């Protein structure tokens, strides 16, 4: 191949170990569109704007649900959880949405007061929409880790119930996010142009 790129530093390390060549690291395609471009396809949400915490975890643990519950109590906001296949009892105090599709997912993030997630895409869209957010165990996921360190928001990772004290509804630094994404979009687009 003439050109190989990956989405995070961890993958670049692995490719280099296997091939002896260092691939370039570029943005995940999710970040190539702006918030306004994503809003054009999101659906309306039938829930109070800005008056809920969105919880989106692909494989939620009991510990994460306990942390989410503690955050809900601290901030006095209900939790809306997007669920697809998990039927665990510890979800009971939350508002459940089983039928949310991709365009609903975007809207729920955009209209939340706070996003709690363990997923890359939950984190990515929180950044794109400049939403206050926290990531469960974000430093253990290569893609999440790469983007948080790139922007300088690694403090948005929460690992245990002891981290609940730092959770708040303060806005993330939208300018810092946009400056980073604008630069990386330009770099990624230039790479694609040259590679094709």
Model-derived features with residue positions:
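Active-site anion-handling motifs in enzyme catalytic cores
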Residues: 1-196
């Amino acid at each position: 191949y003439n050109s190989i790129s990956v989405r995070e530093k961890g993958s670049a390390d692995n490719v280099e170990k296997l091939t002896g060549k260092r691939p370039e690291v570029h943005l995940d395609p999710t970040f190539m569109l702006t918030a306004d471009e994503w809003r054009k396809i999101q659906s309306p949400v039938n829930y109070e704007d800005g008056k809920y915490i969105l919880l989106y975890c692909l494989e939620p643990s009991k510990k994460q649900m306990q942390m989410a519950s503690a955050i809900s109590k601290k901030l006095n906001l209900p939790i809306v959880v997007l669920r697809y296949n998990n039927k665990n009892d510890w979800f009971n105090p939350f508002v459940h949405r089983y039928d949310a599709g991709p365009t609903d997912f975007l809207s729920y993030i955009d209209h939340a007061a706070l996003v709690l997630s363990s997923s890359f895409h939950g984190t990515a869209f929180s950044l794109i929409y400049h939403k206050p957010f926290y990531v469960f165990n974000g430093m253990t996921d290569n893609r999440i880790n790469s983007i948080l360190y790139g922007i300088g928001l690694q403090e948005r990772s929460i690992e245990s119930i002891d981290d609940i004290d730092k959770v708040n509804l303060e806005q993330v630094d939208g300018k810092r996010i946009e400056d980073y994404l604008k630069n990386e979009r330009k770099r990624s687009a230039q790479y694609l142009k040259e590679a094709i």
